[in-house]
Amino acid sequence: MKKLVGSLAAISVLSATGFSYVGYKNVHNQKSVINTHQNEIKRIEKQLKSINNDINIKENELKSLLLEDEKNLISSKDKINKLKQEQRDLVKKDFDQKQMISKLTKDLTNLKLESETKKDQKAKVESELNNLKKTRKHKDELKDYFNKEIKNIQSELKNKTNEFTTNETKIESLKKELDELDKNKDQKKEELKSIKEIINKNYLLLFELNAKLSPYKKLEKQLLELKQQTSLLTKTKEEKQAEIDKQETILKDKQIQLSNLLEEINNNKTKLDQSDNELVNINQQIRDIESQIQNTNDEISKLKEEKEMDLVKVKSDITKINEQVNQLETQSNQTNTNISLLRQQIQKLDKQKETSTLNTQTLEKELNKKNIELEKLIKESESYSTSIKKLESERTQLQTKLDEIIKQNTQKEELIKQLEKELEKLSKRTQRLNVKKILLTSKVSELNKKISDKEKKITSLNKVIESEKK
């Protein structure tokens, strides 16, 4: 660079027209501008390198989060599959419970039929008992009637017995009188005959009374047997009624238990349906989150790719322009060196021409040739300067574009950060869903345990019903 400045200084001193000095001035200013831009580009490249490092760090963090989310999603899918299998098992158990309930319902129907049969038996026994009560009432009426008759006959018999005793006393008295009263013997015989007739009548009446009392005794025996039979039937009825009441109580208790079990099973089924709906909802949310994560990752990748591609392209273009500028500067420096040498040669020839009188034409031709070559080199240098200006203009445009890309990349970086925050929110939401799924799994397990307990109770109830049927 110092050599170039020295050459340009010599040209400015030696140039008569001052044109070379102006060209040097422009080239020097442009060189300063180029150096300033190069320093700015280096500074920007350092910033871009730092930004790229930050982007790589964020990408690694994002990949780590995505890998963790993918593991969580795989684990969630396994849990969902497990829940679906448990749900299918619950549906199968529910179907088995329905079959068991159907069987219990059939057994309950049989128990009801048996109860109806026993109720018919009870009605029949009650009918027989009512008939017996009616018969007993009729016989009680007969008994009362016959008791009244017996009492009347007994009273009459007692009267006759008293009368018989009186007659015997009279006979004794008459016998005494007979012994004492011989005079009235015939009369007494008549009286005795009359008394004997009365006595015979009394004996006949007593026999008739005894004959009348015989069916009453038979009726009393039948009545006693009827009382015993009625007591036995009443006892049998009470036993049957107690058995029916016991079976009705057991049946009613079993019906209540079955009703409660059915209600609990329906409640568990409702809870299972709710769990199934929650699982479907969780699955849908997970699919939505997966879709959002995929879209976000695609958008982040696209932004990073665009950011990298635009930056690399502009940097590449700037590098190419820098290389072209360097090449042109090298060529321009070489041309300027040649111009300096050529001007020295021209000055030398001018001195020779001024001091020498010989070979003037030859020196003139040589000077013309050198001047033509000098003009050609000056035009070439100007062409290099024009090309450098054009390249610098392009580089300035590219620098502006680079600044715009850096600004856009900053915006894209902010957008990437927002998307990463969104990914973090989605990850937390996935974690919450996983916790909810764990709670739901626990709830399903608890429902399974409850259903298992209900199945055991139904089995036990079925055994009790079978034993009652026997």
Curated annotation (Swiss-Prot):
<feature type="signal peptide">
    <location>
        <begin position="1"/>
        <end position="24"/>
    </location>
</feature>
<protein>
    <recommendedName>
        <fullName>Uncharacterized protein MCAP_0864</fullName>
    </recommendedName>
</protein>
<dbReference type="InterPro" id="IPR030944">
    <property type="entry name" value="Mplasa_alph_rch"/>
</dbReference>
<keyword id="KW-0732">Signal</keyword>
